[in-house]
């Protein structure tokens, strides 16, 4: 043991002396290095345990020492003020050379370093990838993955050129909060090789898709781009069909909300990812297709301009697009709004439309058309309705909405299209929406006004038997609360499909005063059921009178009040009481999907 006036400096482990930090008789403060040892190719400072002056050294540079070996002896004493100032003062604003180099490299890929590319983007009426992500995520919450990668093309271009011209390999991606909720966000960068999918970019996607799966994070993807990139010559491959991105992304379906945004040209692999999303948001200038002009021409299918491949007018009407918006700014707003329905109750004060208005929205004249969207808007919290796929399956309205801040899904018949009859497209639209709601624990309200399924030779050529079957199979297997309100017509199998397969399947089935019911269209039922009686009447005028009398009796028998009196529905209600039924029967809401360990459904059907 050294005397109390001395401090021993010993080796904490075996190593080699590579430097002497303080020589005798230099003063040294507590915590300052006396000797530097190297062990396992790492340098370790051996520090003084107390202030003092170096009295003697027991080792020299190059010596090998054992653990516990004496290295130096200090005489206890206070280090000089100069020594303290020299060793303790650190300018926290100083940027070291290594950090400066990292910052410089990051800056190369930012919009500020690429003014020409940014200008071209703005001239075309679009924003950059980074501008879109900055608009989407909450300020100060975004962390980027893989900003330093570049295209795998060093066999044909210089590294400096690739760093400058292919930043992030054309895919800007990371994690940030969207209205307070962590979300994986990514955008192809059309200013980099036309937004094509590079091999290193694929690895970045893979990484983030796995992060989304492990953390249960929603994904928002800006998908503009030209598909696969054949020019990544550094990557040893034949066809690249072992790419994992599409498998990993498809595995997220039904696990987390997936939002795809298309602006400009979105072809091939980019479109494949877009089409795998739960919701597709597309701008007016978008053109979406599974093959771009080069692929089309290469297949001998003619020469086409990019805008001719899958313009918004086509893709909106055929059901590819869920939300049609003017531009990228509106697309970001729509994405934020869509995601809000998957975070539970808002907790914000709500404005409730005057429920008395609902009493007057269905005409007393039973054949008069009305606006079913006015009904939807009148039932739910003001401003809370977000309609999906409005341009497709026109006889069905599918929307997300809220009652007292609680989110739910709405499926309604639109009598202005085919009188509310359900056709193949309408059935597909409703069936897919039901899967979406069930996957993420959103209760479903059906607003029924249908004469039934669309029939006839033309309808059967659209494979209605199978399309209609989807409604029954999916509806019967919903695990979320459901309810049905019959606004006017509730006829046949179509009406049953608007109740999950039958009027006893929902938690409640009620009618408004205008509701009417039948196993099939009543005129057809009378003609079929009274065929012999009607044929026996020789006088045509008398026969028609008998028919009309029977039809009137059938309508009276099928009135909502009589239906409720026979217990086939739960009640006929004042339309102004509709919200009370919804709020009461859908409370408590289903568990939050984010708390589940596994998927409820294997996936959400993309169609």
Residue ranges and their predicted role:
Residues 82-607:
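Ligand-binding clefts of soluble mixed alpha/beta catalytic domains
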Residues 1-36:
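Acidic, low-complexity mobile loops and tails
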Residues 2-9, 39, 78-94:
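Periplasmic scaffold and linker elements that assemble and bridge Gram-negative envelope complexes
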Residues 11-17, 48-56, 65:
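Generic structural motif
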Residues 13, 40-42, 498:
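Methionine-biased hydrophobic packing positions in alpha-helices, especially
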Residues 26-47, 66-82:
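Short hydrophobic beta/alpha edge segments that flank linear recognition/processing sites
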Residues 13, 29, 50, 66, ...:
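A cytosolic small-molecule/anion-sensing beta-strand core signal
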